[in-house]
Amino acid sequence: MWSVSVSPSVFQGIQGMSLSVRQAACVRIQRGMCVCPAGTVAGLGVEGVTPARGGPAGRGGGRGLRRFEEIPHTGSSGWLNLVKFWREDRFKLLHKHMERTFNTLGPIYRERLGTQSTVNILLPSDISELFRSEGLHPRRMTLQPWATHRETRQHSKGVFLKNGAEWRADRLLLNREAMMAPAVRRFLPLLDEVARDFCRQLATRVEKEGGKEERGYSLTIDPSPDLFRFALEASCHVLYGERIGLFSTSPSQESQKFIFAVERMLATTPPLLYLPPRLLWRLGAPLWTQHATAWDIIFSHAEKRIQRGVQRLRSTQAAGGGSGGAEGEFTGILGQLMDKGQLSLELIRANITELMAGGVDTTAVPLQFALYELGRNPAVQEQVRGQVKAAWARGGGDAHKALQGAPLLKGLVKETLRLYPVGITVQRYPVRDIIIQNYHIPAGTCVQACLYPLGRSRDVFQDPERFDPGRWGTQESGEGAGGGGGFRSLAFGFGARQCVGRRIAENEMQLLLMHILLSFRLSVSSSEELSTKYTLILQPETPPRITFSTL
């Protein structure tokens, strides 16, 4: 298996479009250009930001309510801003751009990029106000390129792309099989099995390829390809109730192709968010073709897995066993949904495909960051390992009991995602007018909490540069405490619209980290923080090399 880090030049992407698209974009840029109060054309970035007159007013700052138009912004022309992003290749550093802009403009600002317009916030008290206004059917920004792919290919949409009552009905059914405690107890042993197999295979490799040391063997590798295989193997085991054999000596080429397609899909999404995807589809723009082809591969691979699972479950039914299989046998989320019969097969297919596509990079990449941080923080590593060993002994090797007795494992995942959130924003469209930082924000405005600057803000965290899983057992912890005291850990979203695969991902990462810490000591050659890039998810600029030493 290989891990491809795709970071295409977005500006090259638009150059590959037809002349008519470029001309249309340029016309819209010229028409959208406006003059700021200072008498200059609004730019983008520190040198061109446009703060409100008098600076931003905080909540309770003694100023009267201010108009929406007075919110500090990065430039009035979305198309001009977008071209500057392309020319300066800012998409891959969008998280850094957000951090710099907050440092310049204060805790709230507006931004227009192409067709998108958002209000960006980062303080927990403001995020609390936003989530209080999300309503019964919370909405987040629709990834229009994904939706256009479903529509042009006539695929049904899963809950990720739905809104309103239809979203809520489907989501409640999925919660029972993916989020609730009984569901977690059913699939936890499957995740544990894959995590144990991963560590056994890694131990064999370390002893075979590594150097002999006084206490055992040691091997330095880039673990990212193995972590991607682990993530796909684990998620498929939970979704379909069977292994797909990615730990064999000759893993499936189809599965490797699937992983590559997921990365290509993620890499081509950001530039398409700010352009009209249906127009690009009609014109056959190269950027759109790459994106759609990646999704086609994802759907094709998932369809084969789903069809295989459906045939297996129907054979079991014909034999009188029901979709649930033999007594006590877990047949995966696919089998559970089919057994309940409350979702059509087409909707099951749409949601299983979304879960499968969303379950690879979003767990493999945080695991890279977690292993690196443990390697460059040996004292933290020993602290977590000590708690894990004690919990493992008390639980008699029972994974569920061990996780319950090792809260630092959960803190380790939360701390990793604080510094390196997979998705760098969480959006909502308030159903009523709200006031944030003394600014009036109309209902229906896209407001997004920016997680990367949130996790590194000194106004929110003590010593934010320090990697400290133990901080989540203190007063800093919480995801929804009253008065905005929580809302510091939002990597999986919040409330009814949080990530539907959250419990799978959390337990998958905690279990693998637990077994790695029980088996290996980790070290790295550098104590520097990893450089990062944004390709719809945050990931290392270069995958880190980790030294695994047997205990």
Predicted features, each with a name:
Residues 378-380, 502-539, 543:
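Cytochrome P450 heme-binding "Cys pocket" and the immediately downstream C-terminal segment
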Residues 1-67:
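N-terminal mitochondrial targeting presequence
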Residues 135, 449-479:
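Conserved cytochrome P450 K-helix/beta-meander segment immediately N-terminal to the heme-binding cysteine loop
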Residues 51, 55-89, 94-190, 194, ...:
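Cytochrome P450 substrate-recognition site 1
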Residues 84-106, 300, 396-437, 458:
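Conserved cytochrome P450 K-helix E-x-x-R motif and the immediately C-terminal K′/meander segment
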Residues 474-509, 531-535:
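Cytochrome P450 heme-thiolate "Cys pocket" and heme-binding signature region
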Residues 362-374, 512:
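Short, small-residue alpha-helix embedded
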Residues 143-147, 151, 185-367, 383:
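Cytochrome P450 heme-thiolate monooxygenase catalytic core
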